Regions:
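Hydrophobic, membrane-interfacing alpha helices
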Residues: 1-272
Length: 272
């Protein structure tokens, strides 16, 4: 059995409430990794050959950086509002200013997905790109960012797992008193491996091995994430405000429509 290593969530105190936190650096790393992977993605088909009416390339690093800015806004705003709405609505209703305390942790993937989808839909319309094409482009670049976020969760000592058999070699006692001082699954690491590394490997191989039909890559991301998050949630401590509903956690219920819609869309686009 292991004990969670102590890492101060604050890397550097600046002045007053201002500080550099590991959680914030995890998000910065996520965006840097996206930028690096997007450079490689430009070499994949059909993006490498697409042209504008004047013969200039449609997909360029300038377009990617513009897209990334819109995506960052969508992820941060959607992720934070999603966490407040899905997991702790009453708390943030009575403490609305705490919605702004993003660096203290508390982001929702499902909220971030909705936020970035809306932001990139608007970006695609404004810049003259096909929405499905945009989502196919970004999908393989996303899981490494999810992996970075889970490392941030681990350092913060949040979102720990359910009680585990103390004889499990990697069972861990988390330092947060709310964790009860008992052996638990390090569910952040499970999610790092499943939603991060495994999903990245699957999507990058699928997207780069040959040209795919429009919508195939994006829908596989929705399906793959839904399945892997659903599985990982089995080991994660249910949210205190939700508990289990019909045996499923809040995260699992949010994954159910992703799995259904993702499978339906992937099957549709694959046969198109």
């Amino acid at each position: 059995m292991l004990t969670q290593p102590y890492i101060d969530p604050v890397l550097l105190h600046i002045a007053g409430p201002f500080a550099i936190r590991w959680y914030g650096l995890a998000y910065l790393l996520a965006f840097v990794l996206f930028w690096l992977l997007a450079r490689k993605r430009l070499q994949h088909q059909p993006f490498a050959r697409l042209k504008r009416s004047d013969g200039s390339p449609l997909w360029t690093m300038q377009a990617v950086e513009d897209l990334l800015f819109w995506g960052v806004v969508g992820v941060v705003v959607g992720g934070r509002l999603g966490f407040c709405l899905f997991y702790q609505p009453m708390h943030f209703l009575t403490h609305p200013l705490e919605i702004l305390y993003v660096m203290d942790g508390g982001m929702s993937f499902h909220g971030g997905l909705l936020g970035v989808t809306l932001a990139l839909f608007l970006w695609a319309r404004k810049r003259g790109f096909g929405f499905l094409q945009v989502m196919d482009f970004i999908a393989p670049c996303v899981p490494t960012g999810l992996a970075s976020g889970r490392i941030g969760n681990f350092i913060n000592g949040e979102l720990w797992g359910r009680a585990a058999d103390p004889s499990l070699p990697w069972a861990m006692v988390f330092r947060d008193p709310a964790a009860g001082g008992i052996a638990r699954h390090p569910s952040q690491i499970y999610q790092f491996l499943l939603e991060g590394l495994l999903l990245f490997g699957l999507l990058w191989w699928f997207a780069s091995s040959k040209e795919r039909k429009p919508g195939e890559v994006a829908s596989l991301f929705v399906l793959g994430y839904g399945l892997m998050r659903f599985a990982a949630e089995h080991f994660r401590e249910p949210d205190a405000n939700w508990g289990l509903v019909l045996g499923l956690s809040a995260g699992q219920w949010l994954c159910v429509p992703m799995i259904i819609v993702g499978f339906a869309l992937w099957n549709h686009f694959r046969k198109a």
